[in-house]
From Swiss-Prot:
The IMP cyclohydrolase activity resides in the N-terminal region. This is Bifunctional purine biosynthesis protein PurH. Keywords: Hydrolase, Multifunctional enzyme, Purine biosynthesis, Transferase. Pathway: Purine metabolism; IMP biosynthesis via de novo pathway; 5-formamido-1-(5-phospho-D-ribosyl)imidazole-4-carboxamide from 5-amino-1-(5-phospho-D-ribosyl)imidazole-4-carboxamide (10-formyl THF route): step 1/1; Purine metabolism; IMP biosynthesis via de novo pathway; IMP from 5-formamido-1-(5-phospho-D-ribosyl)imidazole-4-carboxamide: step 1/1. Its EC number is 2.1.2.3, 3.5.4.10.
């Protein structure tokens, strides 16, 4: 197999015009003939480039409003023709070899994302000729290069210059794989969209699938291989969404430290998503995917100091997330006090980074400042299937709350209730959070009975000498019995925030009234499993 193939003729037909003029200029300057279609050809001609319209080359005009323009033997024969094997038949029919194909596809995803997108709009944005050329060129990568990403343009020009106008086989093979990934993702988007408009294969086969398609096609890009998974006997890798915009562990930049482990990534995600809930300077410390300390402060140093107080024992070897720039004072407080696996913040000051350099094993990440959260899907693998749901982006405000007890909460109790409600959303169910003055003082996570989560939160507070009396308590789901309220009253809780909705709500409210506890219903649950 010939390793290098000279590039003499290029076919360019792109929907995304970014960088195409500069790339075509570079090709033309290197003596490469340019073929093009429709809007791409007009753009290149307007830029003064010598370009031949595909319709002039084939002798067959574009037709049907552009639906048919490249579906012609002189195009696909030039792409699929095997050099040294099909030369005779190509010459017989006047087919010129095409050495590089530059194509990206109609913007189907952007079209169907529009609220006013009609079925006709969606259909007209299904690319036919583009994917056909992409797959043809990728199949014949032995002889032809296929380019589907504008980010590859500079590297291709560099390789042409370094190889006397040729591209090597490893480059063509890699480009072909990118092309197959591209068309697979494109077809997946189309199938997912139309799959919501037809009945599912199982269940109610009379109604359209609706929000979730009847066949779910997912495309993720591998970011890194892990040393191992959750445990050392499990292999693992980290895959990310393409073009994700939201600040996240997937988009974060690592400034120092060892490679992130599987558990590091999972815990960092939990910490970062929790700290995003707060607008004031906040710190979240996570251990084994559960917050073990959360606080708001006048500064991130104050927030860290208060979050650490909740549970210093569990904070050892934890993940720390901030919603403000990490400064030197806070960085120094962390590394002088505790062992930490990961620190993540929107940005890190140069002084803080210089201090952290003394602890090279500490993984330091920046994620950029975030705006509004993006809607999306969450997945949970079960044996033989996949559970899919919308991301839990729900959160109540003071205006959404219902006070159901005889006593009204004070302003401070209301602030503390909303604070610990935000934290409870990120604690594994059954989740109980005690908080006072915008600081967690006890967290009970993952217990099979809610009353034991309440008891554990009280034990945690007592172990650290934190005063519970006058604190608020949040529960991620309703109290099925009054025992959780009795346990809270026994340690001095004066305000409880919970979803409500139990068949025994009246008994639970009566228990709150007996103890003089203010009880707030959110009418929103935050199970987390």
């Amino acid at each position: 197999m010939q390793q290098r193939r000279p590039i003499r003729r290029a076919l360019l037909s792109v929907s995304d015009k970014a960088g195409i003029i500069e790339f075509a200029q570079a090709l033309s300057q290197r003596g490469i003939e340019l073929l093009s279609t429709g809007g791409t050809a007009r753009l290149l001609a307007d830029a003064g480039l010598p370009v031949t319209e595909v319709s002039d080359y084939t002798g067959f005009p574009e037709m049907m409003d552009g639906r048919v323009k490249t579906l012609h033997p002189k195009v696909h024969g030039g792409i699929l023709g095997r050099r040294g094997q099909d030369d005779g038949i190509m010459a017989q029919h006047g087919i010129q070899p095409i050495d590089i194909v530059v194509v990206n596809l109609y913007p189907f995803a952007q079209t169907v994302a529009r609220p006013d997108c009609s079925l006709e709009d969606a259909v007209e944005n299904i690319d036919i000729g583009g994917p056909t050329m992409v797959r043809s060129a990728a199949k014949n990568h032995k002889d032809v290069a296929i380019v589907v990403k504008s980010s590859d343009y500079p590297a291709i020009i560099t390789e042409l210059d370094n190889n006397d106008g040729s591209l090597t086989y490893p480059t063509r093979f890699n480009l072909a794989i990118k092309a197959f990934e591209h068309t697979a993702a494109y077809d997946s988007m189309i199938a997912n969209y139309f799959g919501t408009l037809v009945p599912p294969y199982h269940g109610d086969t009379e109604q359209p699938s609706g929000h979730f398609p009847r066949t779910l096609n997912l495309n993720y890009i591998k970011k890194q291989d892990m040393r191992y998974g959750e445990n050392s006997h499990q292999q693992a890798a980290f895959y990310i969404e393409e073009d994700v915009k939201e600040a996240s562990v997937a988009t974060a930049q690592q400034l120092q430290g060892k490679a992130l482990s599987y558990n590091n990534i999972a815990d960092t995600d939990a910490a970062l998503e929790c700290v995003k809930e707060f607008s004031e300077p906040a710190c979240v410390i996570v251990k084994h995917a559960n917050p073990c300390g959360v606080a708001i402060g006048d500064s991130i140093l104050a927030a860290y100091e208060r979050a650490y107080q909740t549970d210093p024992t569990s904070a050892f070897g934890g993940i720390i997330a901030f919603n403000r720039e990490l400064d030197a004072a806070t960085a120094n407080a962390i590394i002088s006090r505790q062992f930490v696996e990961v620190i993540i913040a929107p940005t890190v000051s140069s002084d803080a980074l210089a201090l952290l350099a003394a602890k090279q094993n500490v993984r330091v990440l920046t994620c950029g400042q975030w705006q509004a959260r993006s809607a999306g899907l969450d997945f949970k693998r079960v044996n033989g299937g996949l559970l899919v749901q919308e991301r839990d982006l729900g959160m109540v405000t003071a205006a959404d709350l219902r006070v159901v007890s005889k006593r009204q909460p004070t302003e401070q109790e209301l602030r503390d209730a909303l604070f610990c409600w935000k934290v409870a959303k990120f604690v594994k169910s059954n989740a109980i959070v005690y908080a006072r003055d915008n600081m967690t003082i006890g967290i009970g996570a993952g217990q099979m009975s809610r009353v034991y989560s309440a008891k554990i939160a009280g034990i945690k507070a007592a172990d650290e000498g934190l005063e519970v009396a006058g604190s608020a308590m949040a529960s991620d789901a309703f109290f099925p019995f009054r025992d959780g309220i009795d346990a809270a009253a026994a340690v001095g809780i004066t305000c409880v925030i919970q979803p409500g909705g139990s068949i025994r709500d009246d008994e639970v409210i009566a228990a709150a009234d007996e103890h003089g506890i203010a009880m707030i219903f959110t009418d929103m649950r935050h199970f987390r499993h």
